[in-house]
A protein has these predicted regions:
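Conserved C-terminal portion of the radical SAM core fold
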Residues: 164-223, 239-262
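N-terminal [4Fe-4S]-dependent radical SAM core
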Residues: 1-82
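Acidic (Asp/Glu)-rich catalytic clusters
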Residues: 72-76, 102-109, 129-139, 171-175, ...
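Structural recognition of alpha->loop->beta junctions
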Residues: 46, 106-111, 198-213, 282-297
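Core AdoMet radical
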Residues: 52-68, 72-95, 110-123, 139-165, ...
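Auxiliary Fe-S-binding modules of radical SAM enzymes
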Residues: 2-16, 22-27, 210, 218-302
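Distinct, well-ordered alpha-helical segments
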Residues: 95-103, 124-135, 157, 196
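Generic structural signal for well-ordered alpha-helices
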Residues: 65-70, 99-103, 128-132, 166-170, ...
Length: 302
């Protein structure tokens, strides 16, 4: 039986991590603080990124938080909450601006942690020192978008930073004992299965605490749609995606927490792949295939 499970999952789920650490139901509340992105300053940003207004765009942070909390209190009166600054690059500002966004939320009842999604090129020394201070006062996770280790793909998708910058950011965060979660994307244009597995092998050697695995999806009004229309690059089928994800899980240390294993595209904007709209079917099929293969996270680590 896989060590890190309470429900027969064969990978280390975020649900397991939260239940064993906090002993109660934990909700992650996604917040939009209105941050921009350095990669959009002088260009279009990453080619798969949709530039429309994000969820809760323009709504103050306290209202955003209460909207979710009020919907959960009746069923889970003892629940705890993690604030997730998700939209944009959430350290792309001076420290005083960051404090104005983060500090009021820290004071709310039953808030036990803070997740900050950002980029490795938006972590200067002042920001890093402030994050260290936050980490001493709450359970802090910093999420970094890597997507791929391959330079050719990085240039194609206009990621806007180098692998060396990413490594340096991980080192600086870990020097401050800040937990790091890394985002990767499977199915990026022209990447092979071997390339996707090599991204996981690289991450498995780093001092990271979690990972989010996404499937590339193509949305309306994004530059990647133009690339898809002109090159017709291969979009992974559900079966191909599941096969790759399971192989990736087998190459990951069991203690690395899997925060996400598929995506949540906006239905009205999605062009491809439409199978992503059936999220729970994808998750169920991953579980079934892992049982069929007698697979589990870390199985192939020597």
């Amino acid at each position: 039986m896989f060590k890190y499970t309470l429900d027969n999952k064969r990978y280390h789920t975020l649900n397991y991590y939260n239940k064993t650490k906090y002993g109660c139901k934990v909700f992650k509340v996604s917040l939009n603080a209105g941050f921009s992105c350095p990669n959009k300053k002088n260009g279009t940003g990453c080619i798969y990124c949709y530039n429309g207004s994000g969820e809760n765009d323009g709504m103050d942070l306290l209202t955003q938080f209460n909207k979710v909390r009020d919907n959960t209190l009746k069923k889970w009166p003892n629940a705890k909450y993690i604030r997730y600054f998700q939209a944009g690059t959430n350290t792309y500002a001076d420290v005083n601006t960051l404090k104005s966004k983060y500090e009021p939320i820290l004071k709310l009842d039953n808030v036990i942690g803070l997740n900050i999604a950002t980029r490795c090129d938006a972590l200067n020394s002042n920001v890093l020192d402030y994050l260290e201070d936050l980490n001493n006062r709450t359970d802090l996770i910093v999420e970094l978008g890597l997507q791929t280790i391959h330079e050719s793909t990085s240039i194609l998708i206009n990621r806007g930073h180098t692998l060396e910058q990413f490594e340096e950011a991980v080192l600086e965060l870990r020097k401050r004992n800040i937990n790091v979660v890394v985002h990767i994307i499977n199915g990026l244009p022209f990447e092979t299965k071997e390339m996707m597995l090599n991204t996981i092998k690289y991450l498995n050697k780093l001092d990271i605490q979690g990972i989010k695995i996404h499937m590339l999806f193509i949305l309306k009004d994004t530059p990647i749609l133009n690339l898809y229309n002109t090159t017709n690059f291969h979009i992974l089928s559900k079966e191909e995606y599941i096969d790759i994800v399971i192989d990736q899980l087998e190459l990951l240390r069991p203690e690395i927490v899997i925060h996400r294993i598929t995506g949540d595209p906006i239905k009205e904007l999605l062009i491809e792949p439409t199978w992503l709209l059936k999220k729970f079917s994808v998750l169920d099929d991953i579980d079934k295939e892992m049982v069929k293969r007698d697979s589990y996270q870390g199985k192939r680590i020597q």
